UniProtKB/Swiss-Prot annotation:
S-adenosyl-L-methionine binds at H19, L21, G46, E67, D92, N107. Keywords: Cytoplasm, Methyltransferase, RNA-binding, rRNA processing, S-adenosyl-L-methionine, Transferase. The keyword NADP does not apply. SMART domains: rADc (SM00650). One of its GO terms (cellular component) is cytoplasm. It is found in: Cytoplasm. This is Probable ribosomal RNA small subunit methyltransferase A. The gene is rsmA. One of its GO terms (molecular function) is rRNA (adenine-N6,N6-)-dimethyltransferase activity. Its main location: cytoplasm. Its EC number is 2.1.1.-. SUPFAM superfamilies: S-adenosyl-L-methionine-dependent methyltransferases (SSF53335). Pfam families: RrnaAD (PF00398).
Amino acid sequence: MVRSILKKYNIKGGTFDQHFLIDAGYLDRIVAAAELSPQDTVLEIGAGIGNLTERLARRAKKVIAVELDPALVSVLHDRFDAAENIEIIAGDALKVDFPEFDKVVSNLPYSISSEITFKLLRHKFKLGVLMYQYEFAVRMVSPPGCKDYSRLTIDTCYFADASIVMKVPKGAFQPAPEVDSAVIKLIPRPAPFEVRDETFFLQFVAAVFSQRRKKLRNAILNTSSLLKIPDIKEIVSQLPEDFMNKRAEDLTPEELASVANMIFDLKSRNF
């Protein structure tokens, strides 16, 4: 079915980071993972030729399909303009104002994985089922101390529960990407730890993971300009030694939040 659509419209892929999922088994498993109901409005980013769109529309109340490539937008209109429950939005998903939606299910363009994920996580929705490059997906769910534990892990953990649903081999796509992929399930929820100031916490995580191999004391001192703290030495001198002598990659999200909160409180006192 998918190959026939690609042939009919002379779609080659490769433009706009396009890799079309052509394996029907994986398409069906993605839809099943979304646990759709007839009441759900589903957002799909990078709808492509509509092979996932079509399956989503069978189970959901409405599908909002976002696509950047004008050629593919034309394909989507040709295939689905008669469908009452599919809305097609032509545009860049990073710039489009998303309508309200309940769930997001997408084979994401890999080049915008980080940006689009955190744009999504700032929206209210029930569940996400999203395709990423495999290594990116692993970084989203890695425990502290692992080589893949990163800023991405912390940021994801702050906004949502994340788990790998399945690994998808590169041969399931046309054209095949260079690496395997994985499907992540995201369930947004309130932060599992206290953060005094969300913006500062996320800046702090970005700063210390930019020097992840250094002890936290040095990582903080070396990134004071990023954190906009002129009196950083005075503040660091008041932070617990057991944290300062560890690397950022060895601290749990809760511990990093604790350090960020202490710095924020001390900074607010204007030493």
